[in-house]
Amino acid sequence: MEPDTTRRSACDRCRGQKLRCVRLPGPAREDSPRSARSVNQPCERCKRAKVVCYTTKPVSRRLPQSYTRRRSTAYADDVMHSEVDLDEGMIGSNRLRDEPTIKRTPPAIADRLAHDPFPTELWSGLDISHASLDSSAVLSHVPDPGNMVESVAAQRANSNTLPSHQHGWPEDPHGALNYFEERAHDLPDVMSVSSPTDVRLGLDTVDRRPAAATSRTNQAIHSDTVNMHSQAPGSGETSERGLYSRASNTVADAAQLCTTQLSELNMRLMKDIESTTSFRQGMSAASDPNYPASGLGETSPSSSMVKFTNTMLANCQSFLDILQRLRSPTVELRGSSNSECSYGDLEYSSNEYSSSRSQSRNHSTSASSRSKDGRISAGGGLQSVLNSDTIGLSPSLDPIKADSSALDFSAFLSILSCYTHILRAYDALFTEILEMLMESSCIQLDLKIHNLVPEVSLGGFRLSGHGDLQIKCLLHMSFIILEKIESMLGVNAPEKDPYGSNGGLLNNSQLRGLLEALYHQKEFDYIRADGTRAARVKKTMKSIQRILDSI
């Protein structure tokens, strides 16, 4: 068999054009064992065209017998140091094929042109001077392998590319091997190429890694995949328990904030109630016929009533906002029979938004539950959103963990205290208004209460100066406010609510008795002066309404 360097007789130019190449063979050069071109005389066609005539050595498809596995840091525990020895022949014949795969000019050409890209025998027959065939100028488009690897690594590391003479590794083959061996773990990460243990054979890839290392790698990848899927949301029971945890933390934070706001509101209400004696004395003085009408201005006794009315309405607004936030978690997910959650099944449990109060329920939210730390959860309040029966999720989840988000007993007492102070404020205000109506005429009423509810207008009509209209507006608005507060608290809820969806925050077995003893109204026909405060306030409001209708 002829040598590898001469078994392909046609030059690359003639072979690419599928033409017959006619030339005389010449002696091979002994000083260039790694040359990619056989040293022959130029063929007739290349000589006439005045181009370089060369023949590329075909790539061998056989692995050399001296091939040994190169050690990689990923498999350092499985490959011994004794297996790292590479002979000089292996470095010369398979060096470029063991390097990471990079898109470039065929490596055999670039590597074997490093010594002498234009031998004398190739250009001696051409009318081209040797100076014009400077390798650095003519082959500037052919990248050097060392510069190529370094430039790619430098671009990935945001550093400047070094010239070929500043690559940093020794010129000795064994020294260069040790240099790359110490930095082998940087090549796959920086250049994003396959492992050096993969040998490229044409279009096929042979994995030379040990079987044990391959199995351990597959197990590690499988475990990472399992961990990733286990942490992904929406994966069965884990995601459902995560939903409970996130909902429980959110509701607990909201409950703590509402408890703090209730305490602050309670202190403000107590302070405002103490100021009722001042405006009562002022209104008593204003009801005196000897009191001059000219004194009814900013310094008149009615100004204290106006200030008290504005403060009371602002406190009612704050109290309603807090109650609304406490009731907002009672959005129930009415799931289908297979426990699937649907947006079309959302139903709000508050009185003003509920559209199906008469629908039957399979559970009672009015029944309260006590958590491990002794806190009470209000029926229909924060607890109902976290019941496994209420939320359309898997019934296998444990609803006991939801007790941590329930309000404590001090929060319920703050709610009762705020409601008590609001009733006292309304009682004091409407009692004074009723006394003025019974003692004064409509004209005197306009003089005494000329701006009870300031900055109120209906379209283009302003209520300033119309005392009777302002009182009617205040009556209707106050009545609606009290009804809304009582609805949220559960004051007027039935004693035996089989479903409990509209029971309110305080309508449960622990607080029901206290609520009834303090504020539960009786029928108005049986109420006298010694009736409860809530019933007395509403009775006073109805009396004022009858007087205003008769004027």
UniProtKB/Swiss-Prot annotation:
The UniProt induction remark is: Expression is down-regulated by ralstonins, lipopeptides produced by the plant pathogenic bacteria Ralstonia solanacearum.
What SUPFAM superfamilies has UniProt attached to this entry?
Zn2/Cys6 DNA-binding domain
**Skewed-composition ranges (Low complexity):** 351-369
What name appears for this protein in its UniProt entry? Answer: C6 finger transcription factor imqK
Q: What is the source species? A: Aspergillus flavus (strain ATCC 200026 / FGSC A1120 / IAM 13836 / NRRL 3357 / JCM 12722 / SRRC 167)
Q: Which GO terms describe its biological process?
A: positive regulation of metabolic process
* Subcellular location(s) of the protein: Nucleus
Residue ranges flagged as DNA-binding region:
11-53
Please provide the record's keywords in A-Z order.
DNA-binding, Metal-binding, Nucleus, Transcription, Transcription regulation, Zinc
InterPro entries annotated for this entry?
Zn2-C6_fun-type_DNA-bd_sf, Zn2Cys6_DnaBD
Where is it mainly found?
nucleus
